[in-house]
């Protein structure tokens, strides 16, 4: 969904809002793609945080190399 949104989005500060309005109004099912992207990314990050919480609960932080690689992957995901 991000690829379809990126084809119509303009990151310029003057035209960003109008490009989002263009996606919602003029692109076929653009509103659906936008909402599916927002909900899908929210679900992805909820699952990511649950996975981290599971690792904390089961004491996986004692494996420092594995834990540090996971933290690096978390930061790369958010970047």
Curated annotation (Swiss-Prot):
Annotated residues for binding of heme b b566: 51
Localization (cell): Mitochondrion inner membrane
Cofactor: how bound: Binds 2 heme b groups non-covalently.
SUPFAM superfamilies xref list: Transmembrane di-heme cytochromes (SSF81342)
GO biological process, one term: mitochondrial electron transport, ubiquinol to cytochrome c
Binding site for heme b b562: 37
Keyword Transmembrane helix: yes
GO terms of molecular function: metal ion binding; ubiquinol-cytochrome-c reductase activity
Keyword Iron: yes
Cofactor: heme b
GO cellular component: mitochondrial inner membrane
UniProt topology in membrane: Multi-pass membrane protein
Pfam family, one: Cytochrome_B
Highest taxon of source: Eukaryota
Keywords: Electron transport, Heme, Iron, Membrane, Metal-binding, Mitochondrion, Mitochondrion inner membrane, Respiratory chain, Transmembrane, Transmembrane helix, Transport, Ubiquinone
Transmembrane segments: 1-7, 31-52, 67-79
Subunit structure: The cytochrome bc1 complex contains 11 subunits: 3 respiratory subunits (MT-CYB, CYC1 and UQCRFS1), 2 core proteins (UQCRC1 and UQCRC2) and 6 low-molecular weight proteins (UQCRH/QCR6, UQCRB/QCR7, UQCRQ/QCR8, UQCR10/QCR9, UQCR11/QCR10 and a cleavage product of UQCRFS1). This cytochrome bc1 complex then forms a dimer.
Family membership: Belongs to the cytochrome b family.
More about this protein: Heme 1 (or BL or b562) is low-potential and absorbs at about 562 nm, and heme 2 (or BH or b566) is high-potential and absorbs at about 566 nm.
Functional note: Component of the ubiquinol-cytochrome c reductase complex (complex III or cytochrome b-c1 complex) that is part of the mitochondrial respiratory chain. The b-c1 complex mediates electron transfer from ubiquinol to cytochrome c. Contributes to the generation of a proton gradient across the mitochondrial membrane that is then used for ATP synthesis.
Name used for this protein in its record: Cytochrome b
